[in-house]
UniProtKB/Swiss-Prot annotation:
A motif (DESH box) lies at residues 206-209. ATP binds at L113, A114, C115, G116, F117, G118, K119, T120. InterPro entries: Helicase/UvrB_N, Helicase_ATP-bd, Helicase_Restrict-Modif_Enz, P-loop_NTPase. GO terms for molecular function: ATP binding; DNA binding; helicase activity; hydrolase activity. DNA helicase which seems to act as a postreplicative transcription termination factor. Involved in ATP-dependent release of nascent RNA. Forms a stable complex with single-stranded DNA, and to a lesser extent RNA. The keyword Methyltransferase does not apply. Its EC number is 3.6.4.-. PANTHER family: ATP-DEPENDENT HELICASE IRC3-RELATED (PTHR47396:SF1), TYPE I RESTRICTION ENZYME ECOKI R PROTEIN (PTHR47396). One of its GO terms (cellular component) is virion component. This is Transcript termination protein A18. Belongs to the helicase family. Poxviruses subfamily.
Amino acid sequence: MSLLKMEYNLYTELKKMTCGQSLSLFNEDGDFVEVEPGSSFKFLIPKGFYSSPSVKTSLVFETLTTTDNKITSINPTNAPKLYPIQCKVVSEVVSNMRKMIELKRPLYITLHLACGFGKTITTCYLMAIHGRKTVICVPNKMLIHQWKTQVEAVGLEHKISIDGVSILLKELKTQSPDVLIVVSRHLTNDAFCKYINKHYDLFILDESHTYNLMNNTAVTRFLAYYPPMMCYFLTATPRPSNRIYCNSIINIAKLSDLKKTIYVVDSFFEPYSTDNIRHMIKRLDGASNKYHIYTEKLLSVDEPRNQLILNTLVEEFKSGTINRILVITKLREHMVLFYKRLLNLFGPEVVFIGDAQNRRTPDMVKSIKELNRFIFVSTLFYSGTGLDIPSLDSLFICSAVINNMQIEQLLGRVCRETALLDRRVYVFPNTSIKEIKYMIGNFVQRIISLSVDKLGFKQESYRKHQESDPTSACTTSSREERVLNRIFNSQNR
């Protein structure tokens, strides 16, 4: 730990990384406070900040030669086989770490790699190279299985802890596994933090973007007060301010053969309203809608739009155009609505729900990976980041209010490299609730723009359903309605 006075140059360097947000650190009294320019207090500067050689410092940091937390059970023949692009990442990491050791810099690296790159297998390869006892920290239980599979493939002795940190600490008195796989809430326990700081050299923070380290969280406190000897942050969408805790970044572009298309399912709706909708509309401009809660609630009860989503999905699934579908909503009640309706159509052998309130959901996710055809309905919170179903070929985004980081993570669920190359995303920019039509159009346009401009998707209009089903709510049977549709869409965007 390094307690330093906040001099001008240090403050400027740290503040630059927050991209205009407030800069918060632990002060000498242990309080997590916002740092003001010219402050006379001393602050705890994160170890990982000094991993970049561009940061000037006279501090000298320990290297691995001073510890003895080595893995003794490594068999080099068990190291996973990597693609050439993954080997390039490994080469970059090894080269950077040699320089860090030479310069006495902390061995902290952020692996900023695209969704579907194979961050888990690449990091397991690095873990085998380092040969150091490792803690893998994940934000939720759902991500544990993919790490377990890769760690077992490398042949390392490991322990998974999901039943509570107190039970784990008791077990660690009689055993010392080479790899610990834990959920991040374990870091709220100081005794556990002290233990891994002493007995484990490598700390891997998976999905690091899910943690805002400018907040006083368990991960923030751990990295500040119990900094590991080596650390990897893994993410496809890094938070700029998190660089303060891990200031060396490796980012290698990934070329893909995937054919990625985002289908814009336009429709012209007659205005739709109910007593419930009218009641929620009154709350749109109030403080209760600060995070667009009521905007999403209105979408969840927009019956014509919901029916359009269902009609599109059913037609595409029945035709065999898509086979392994992820349906994403923002709200749980919206998820349950789609699940029940799809369950009535296709049955429990095909339709599954990714419910955060069901403890069996992670086991269910494992079971559907081998299915040739399925529909998985879940929420953005549960399945928007880290969902490990590589075979997904299509995504239906029923929500609208999603930030850029969430959009990129969500689209990454259908960008995993497999033998099948076609990937389809369906978005629905229209609503029958006139009070939110422009807002929804703008939010969905942001999804479209990011997918095309940054992630390499091709945009196409989806017309099949409207032309083939004259009885649906989204029928455009006349030339006049098609003209109105085009006018409406141009206004929406």
